[in-house]
Amino acid sequence: MQADIVSYSNATNQVIRPSITNNAGVVIQPAVIFNYATGLNMIKYGGFFQMGKRFFDNRLGINAGIRTDMNDFTTSGSNPLRTLSPRLSLSYVLADKITLNASAGVYYKLAPYTSLGFKDAAGNYVNRGADYLRSTHYVAGLEYLPSDATRFTLEGFYKRYSQVPISVKDGISLSNLGGDFNVLGNEPITTNGTGRSFGFEFFAQQKLTQRFFGVFSYTYFNSKYSNVSGVLIPSTWDNRHLLSILLGFKLPRNWELGLKFRYQGGLPNTPYNETASRLNFITLGTGILDYTRLNSERLQAFHSSDIRIDKKWNYKKVTLDLFLDITNWYLAKSPAPPFYAFRRNADNTGFQTTDGLPVNTNGSNAVPFYLNNSDAVFAPTFGFIVEF
């Protein structure tokens, strides 16, 4: 059994649009400011049971369990049958160095606190009826251990999601948003969305022997969530390809060299609604995304590398390690969605227009353009470690 007391609060003061004044200081367009405060307290509780046993001279291992999660806040949160989640895992030694692993299970996750704590104008919690997000996992794979220092695994997975939160306002899954790291779920939601993901992972590891160690990992996956009409759309984090390589070398005279390389496929991207963006840019100061084409485009793939050099001095009672760690040493740019904007004039005193007149509030004479948001982050770090 387990129980947790949860306290959540959210206070927001956001300037949607600053006020605009003329040369005489008279306000010609008032500011739009969003003030919002909410909070909730709840008790989360539940229970689980698990057991395991080995058979056939320890060649077969079986672990089984069951779990339920409840809370005292949501409408159906106190019903243990709504979140009953069985799990089963198997491990079978096929040969001396080869093992087959498989597992299946159901998992539940409470809706985001931002959604549960959302209140309407009358102060009522509008998302108390939200269900727990349900996910069903199936995983199977092989593990090969040719030596104590070397390990290979190949694993495939399939996951199915239901009761996924969907925005009532936009009709899209919260799991298809979030690439810009904004707060999600602070709005009315329903929990009738679905989703699925599948893929495989290959992993290889060579532990330190003599002067070398290395780790290689490649994952392919496909992840989609439905909108309000049930159509599956690529999720915000659907990179498809993830590659990571870590290499380390111990050199003579206590020098060490480490190298890390990572690659990820392009993230899904939602284009701007050109018409709505032009009409509202002067008011909002930003473009408006076209949710009818949600995640229909992709950014470029990303790759970068880090390098680290260590030099150690070993004394009787202490070891001194000086290191230089350089993140993204070849200055790879991280792809990011562009910003929609109106082009400024040459002296940056206003917006450039097609007719030479002041920009219209509907943007009809403005010159829209996209501001590239991709940038390279280069971070060298020099430091030392003292071990006693």
What kind of region is each of these model predictions?
Residues 1-61, 188-198, 369, 373:
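Outer-membrane beta-barrel transmembrane domain signature of Gram-negative proteins
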Residues 39-75, 83-87, 96-138, 158-183, 203-222, 260-284, 336:
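Surface-exposed extracellular loop regions of Gram-negative outer-membrane beta-barrel proteins
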Residues 162, 214, 263-285, 300-304, ...:
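C-terminal beta-signal and adjacent terminal beta-strands/loops
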Residues 29-42, 127-131, 151-215, 242, ...:
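Outer membrane beta-barrel strand-and-loop segments of large Gram-negative receptors
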Residues 1-7, 47, 64-70, 102-106, ...:
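Transmembrane beta-barrel strands of outer-membrane/channel proteins
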Residues 58-62, 97-100, 148-152, 211-214, ...:
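Repeated loop/turn-to-beta-strand initiation elements of outer-membrane beta-barrel proteins
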Residues 55-57, 158-160, 181-273:
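Gram-negative outer-membrane beta-barrel transporters
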